[in-house]
């Protein structure tokens, strides 16, 4: 089990390491910027470890640090309204899609009910992002 957890931690950590080519935010932050909320996101991964009885895992979480207009936000759970949270979530999702480039001719984006819950401040930027950054997915 320890070996498996080490393999997972090593691979997953690369998604959050700023110097890694696998870093999520290399693709997600530019998308988030296009929403115009002036939010800078930093993600920190706390490595998984087994419980002492090896029946479960603990410390398996990702923490988000937020800056707004270059100022650190100490209580993001209070600061982030639904529109900002939606923009962050969509940016991470689309950043992961962009990061994992598909070398196949048919590129599909599954957005399902994403537009239903979006307010107008996010709908228009999202349409622009899809048009500019995911044009090859719209064929």
What are these regions (language model features)?
Residues 90, 125-130:
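Conserved hydrophobic alpha-helix in the ABC-type ATPase nucleotide-binding domain
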Residues 112, 116-120:
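ABC-family nucleotide-binding domains
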Residues 63-93, 118:
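Conserved ABC ATPase signature
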Residues 55-62:
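Short, flexible loop/turn motifs enriched in small residues
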Residues 105-107, 135-139:
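Loop/turn-to-beta-strand initiation segments
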Residues 80, 98-107:
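Short basic/glycine-enriched coil/helix segment immediately N-terminal to the Walker B
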Residues 82, 103, 119-120, 124:
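Conserved D-loop-proximal element of ABC-family nucleotide-binding domains
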Residues 3-55:
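Amphipathic alpha-helical domain-onset/packing element
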């Amino acid at each position: 089990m320890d070996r498996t957890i080490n393999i997972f931690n090593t691979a997953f950590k690369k998604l959050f390491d700023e110097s890694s080519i696998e870093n999520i935010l290399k693709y997600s932050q530019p998308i988030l910027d296009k929403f115009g909320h002036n939010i800078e996101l930093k993600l920190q991964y706390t490595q998984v470890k087994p419980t002492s009885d090896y029946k479960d895992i603990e410390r398996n979480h990702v923490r988000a640090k937020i800056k707004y207009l270059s100022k650190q936000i100490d209580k993001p759970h209070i600061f982030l309204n639904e529109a900002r949270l939606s923009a962050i979530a969509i940016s991470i999702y689309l950043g992961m899609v962009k990061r994992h480039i598909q070398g196949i001719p048919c590129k599909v984006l599954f957005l399902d009910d994403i537009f239903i819950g979006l307010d107008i401040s996010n709908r228009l930027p999202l349409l622009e992002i899809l048009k500019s950054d995911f044009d090859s997915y719209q064929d």
